[in-house]
Amino acid sequence: METSPESIPIALGQEDDGRWWADIDCMPGVMAYGPTREAAISAVRALALRVAADLIDHGENVPPQLEKLFSAA
């Protein structure tokens, strides 16, 4: 099975003030907030891709869950 952004587990929660948070456990520090569940998911997915791109730019390895997103054919 191919890895896709949808198959990377995202933890979700809602703060007392109503904001939603989303976190990707395999990428420490990748957490985002949004006014809705969907907005938080979208924000954390975009952040995860930015962090992965930065890791690649600096010659570092991306988490194994993201490897197939960037592997050559």
Where would I find each of the regions flagged by the language model?
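Short, charged, surface-exposed hinge/linker loops at domain edges
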Residues: 1-9, 38-73
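Short amphipathic alpha-helical segments, especially helix-boundary/capping motifs
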Residues: 4-5, 26-28
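Short aromatic-glycine-(Arg/Gly/Cys) micro-motifs in beta-strand/loop hairpins
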Residues: 12-27
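A short, exposed loop/beta-hairpin motif centered on an aromatic-Gly-Thr core
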Residues: 28-39
